[in-house]
């Protein structure tokens, strides 16, 4: 893995994936931002460059007249952060699970299922990346596509390194590993005061990532027959009466058959809000091919669970705190 280091005046910049440094893979990466910076600091120390230090205070910088002075820190500034988690959907279930996720909006972004069915990402309605770039993808496929040939060419097909990577890919396939990843862009970090290493409170990212991982909580409706939507509305507590549920379910049936609604009408807004609580958005065009013939549960059925590293997996050896 390549780490890029650049120096301009007194500005030192390092970019790259620290969880891949000195490793064949990053299926299970570094647990904290501090451990990521620690890897960069180790690299800098080895080549005789100054290491990053934590911010201790913020000071007003220079500004033109009538302009607000920007804040200047006395330590390292974080420009981008990637948060990842692995989920095990079960052997052979990866693509169905990803297809199911592609029916769910996230943070006002629209899902886009890639043509090969191996990944889904979320973009703005104009097709742009906003403050965050979320994606979920088939991890075994990603490693076969981007890592396997490189490792074979570098170490040979008979090498221990190549066969170790094959074992990891087999593990991913046997467990149906899907990767949840969010790339937090610089503007997002600045907007939420998360760019000052040492001063910023990164605990809020736990809630952000938990919300992303819980996208599948509403997916059970995608495996239902439309006749059962009314029952699901009641059991989920969205409505209290069967009559109200049946009325809302009719909107879903009309949507399924291609009906276009007038969202300026109050009753349409009401029924859309109800249906969104169980994972159906009648404001988006119904794509029947995106509805996966499975039931997704946290506890053919997909049982999604935490992906635990096998005992033989080689963990990062550079986990000391920076």
Curated annotation (Swiss-Prot):
It catalyses: ATP + (deoxyribonucleotide)n-3'-hydroxyl + 5'-phospho-(deoxyribonucleotide)m = (deoxyribonucleotide)n+m + AMP + diphosphate. Keywords: DNA replication, DNA-binding, Endonuclease, Hydrolase, Ligase, Nuclease. GO terms for molecular function: DNA binding; DNA ligase (ATP) activity; endonuclease activity. InterPro entries: G2P_C. Pfam families: G2P_X_C. It comes from the Viruses. Its EC number is 3.1.21.-, 6.5.1.1. One of its GO terms (biological process) is DNA replication. Belongs to the inovirus G2P protein family. Isoform G2P plays an essential role in viral DNA replication. Binds the origin of replication and cleaves the dsDNA replicative form I (RFI) and becomes covalently bound to it via phosphotyrosine bond, generating the dsDNA replicative form II (RFII). In turn, viral DNA replication initiates at the 3'-OH of the cleavage site. After one round of rolling circle synthesis, protein G2P is linked to the newly synthesized ssDNA and joins the ends of the displaced strand to generate a circular single-stranded molecule ready to be packed into a virion. Isoform G10P protein binds to double-stranded DNA and prevents hydrolysis by nucleases. Additionally, G10P is an inhibitor of DNA replication and may have a role in the transition from semiconservative replicative form DNA replication to single-stranded DNA synthesis in the life cycle. This is Replication-associated protein G2P.
């Amino acid at each position: 893995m390549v780490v890029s280091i650049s120096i301009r005046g007194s500005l030192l910049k390092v970019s790259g994936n620290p969880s891949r440094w000195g490793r064949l893979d990053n299926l299970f990466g570094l647990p904290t931002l501090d451990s990521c910076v620690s890897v960069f600091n180790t690299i800098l120390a080895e080549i005789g460059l100054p290491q990053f230090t934590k911010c201790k205070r913020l000071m007003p910088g220079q500004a033109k007249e009538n302009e607000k002075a920007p804040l200047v820190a006395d330590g390292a500034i974080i420009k981008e952060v990637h948060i990842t988690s692995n989920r095990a959907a079960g052997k052979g279930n990866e693509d169905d699970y990803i297809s199911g996720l592609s029916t769910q909006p996230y943070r006002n972004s629209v899902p886009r299922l890639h043509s090969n069915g191996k990944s889904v990402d979320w973009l703005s309605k104009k097709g742009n990346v906003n403050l965050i770039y979320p994606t979920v993808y088939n991890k075994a496929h990603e490693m076969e596509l981007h890592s396997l040939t490189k490792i074979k060419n570098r170490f040979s097909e008979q090498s221990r390194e190549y066969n170790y990577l094959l074992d990891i890919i087999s593990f991913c396939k046997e467990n149906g590993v899907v990767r949840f990843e969010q790339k937090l862009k610089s503007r997002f970090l600045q907007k939420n005061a998360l760019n000052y290493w040492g001063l910023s409170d990164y605990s809020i990212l736990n809630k952000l990532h938990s919300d992303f991982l819980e996208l599948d909580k509403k997916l059970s409706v995608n495996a239902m027959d439309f006749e059962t939507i009314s029952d699901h509305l009641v059991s989920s507590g969205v409505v209290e009466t069967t009559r109200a549920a049946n009325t809302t379910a009719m909107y879903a049936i009309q949507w399924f058959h291609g009906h276009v609604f007038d969202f300026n009408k109050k009753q349409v807004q009401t029924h859309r809000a109800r249906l969104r609580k169980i994972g159906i958005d009648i404001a988006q065009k119904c794509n029947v091919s995106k509805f996966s013939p499975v039931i997704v549960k946290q506890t053919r059925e997909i049982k999604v669970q935490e992906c635990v590293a096998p005992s033989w997996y080689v963990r990062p050896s550079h986990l000391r705190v920076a």
